[in-house]
C-alpha cells in the first residue's frame, strides 16, 4: 500500500485532507484488521474508551475536485479484496460486517435494468451490431448490446462463467481483434491508479473505436457544491475509493489520449438501490 501524495486523475499536487474511517469489511479483507473496543481495564492513560476503527484520510484535489481515499492498494491487496468477488465466500464474509448484503448481491448478479438506456446513448456512436470488448465485464450480464453484438468479448480476471453468446479473452487475444466499442463500466472507482487503467484500455482501441465509460456520480459529489463541505461530508471509505467530478474524469481521459464526445449524469437503479452514474462516450483524441 502507498499513501497518495498527488491527485490520481490530474496529477495535481495541491490536496486537502480530512480524517476518515476505512470500513470494517474492507479493513478486514485487506489487512485482517477488525474494530476493537478499548476498555477501562486496558489502563490507557491518553486513549479514550470506545470502539477503535481503522483510520484513513479523505483527500480532495484542489484542481479537479477528485475526492479519494489516501490509501492506494497494491496488486496483491486488490487481489485479496476482490477474491471471489460477489461469490459465495465473498458474500458470506461481507454479510458478517454488513447484514443484508447477500440479498442485495443476489439482485446485482441478475444484472441492471438500464442497459437499454446505455444502448440508446451509444446508438449513434457504434454500428447496430457492434464488436464489443467489455473490459472488467465480469460475466458480461450488463454488457451493452448483449445478445445482438457481432462479437461479445470479456477481458476480466474474475473467472466467473460468462453469459450465453460471450467469450472470455486474454490480453493477447483482445489486442489481436478490432472492436467498435470498448466498455469499462463501474471499474475505475475501485482501482488505485485510474489513469493507468485508462491508458491500458486505450491500447485496445482503434481510431474509430468508441469507449463507453461508466462511473458512479456519488451523491456527496453531486449534491454538495462547496468543496470544503463535500470533503467534510466524506467520513468513511468502502470499495469505491475514487469519487469523480466531471473535471477529474476529463483529466484522467486526457492522460490516456482520450477525449469525451458525450457525457451525461443520470439516475439508475441497480441491486434495488437508486443512484446516479456518469455515462461517457469517449474516443482517441485526434
Task: Kindly give the residue locations of the regions a language model identified.
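Conserved beta-strand signature within the Rossmann-like core of class I S-adenosyl-L-methionine
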Residues: 208-217
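Conserved N-terminal segment of class I S-adenosyl-L-methionine
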Residues: 1-185, 194-198, 204, 212, ...
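Extracytoplasmic/secreted proteins and extracellular or luminal domains
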Residues: 175, 256-257
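Short alpha-helix
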Residues: 240-256
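Short "lid" loop at the C-terminus of a central beta-strand within the Rossmann-like core
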Residues: 22, 216-222, 242, 267
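Flexible internal linker/loop segments at domain or repeat junctions
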Residues: 221-229
Amino acid at each position: 500500500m502507498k499513501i497518495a501524495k498527488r491527485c490520481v486523475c490530474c496529477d495535481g499536487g495541491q490536496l486537502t485532507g480530512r480524517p476518515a474511517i476505512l470500513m470494517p469489511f474492507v479493513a478486514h479483507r485487506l489487512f485482517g484488521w477488525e474494530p476493537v473496543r478499548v476498555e477501562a481495564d486496558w489502563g490507557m492513560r491518553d486513549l479514550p474508551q470506545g470502539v477503535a476503527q481503522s483510520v484513513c484520510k479523505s483527500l480532495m484535489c484542489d484542481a479537479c475536485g477528485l475526492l479519494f481515499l489516501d490509501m492506494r492498494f497494491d496488486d496483491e491487496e486488490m487481489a485479496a479484496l476482490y477474491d471471489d468477488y460477489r461469490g459465495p465466500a465473498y458474500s458470506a464474509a461481507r454479510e458478517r460486517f454488513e447484514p443484508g448484503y447477500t440479498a442485495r448481491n443476489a439482485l446485482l448478479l441478475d444484472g441492471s435494468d438500464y442497459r437499454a438506456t446505455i444502448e440508446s446513448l451509444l446508438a449513434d456512436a457504434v454500428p447496430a451490431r457492434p464488436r464489443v470488448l467489455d473490459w472488467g465485464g465480469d460475466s458480461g450480464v450488463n454488457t451493452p448490446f448483449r445478445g445482438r453484438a457481432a462479437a461479445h468479448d470479456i477481458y476480466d480476471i474474475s473467472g466467473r462463467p460468462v453469459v450465453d453468446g460471450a467469450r472470455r479473452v486474454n490480453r493477447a487475444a483482445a489486442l489481436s481483434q478490432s472492436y467498435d466499442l470498448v466498455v469499462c463500466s463501474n471499474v475505475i472507482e475501485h482501482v488505485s491508479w485510474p489513469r493507468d487503467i485508462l491508458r491500458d484500455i486505450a491500447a485496445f482501441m482503434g481510431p474509430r473505436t468508441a469507449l463507453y465509460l461508466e462511473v458512479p456520480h456519488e451523491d456527496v459529489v453531486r449534491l454538495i457544491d462547496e468543496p470544503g463541505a463535500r470533503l467534510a461530508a466524506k467520513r468513511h471509505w468502502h470499495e469505491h475509493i475514487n469519487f469523480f467530478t466531471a473535471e477529474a474524469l476529463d483529466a484522467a481521459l486526457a492522460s490516456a489520449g482520450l477525449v469525451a464526445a458525450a457525457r451525461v449524469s443520470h439516475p439508475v437503479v441497480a441491486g434495488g438501490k437508486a443512484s446516479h452514474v456518469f455515462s461517457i462516450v469517449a474516443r482517441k483524441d485526434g
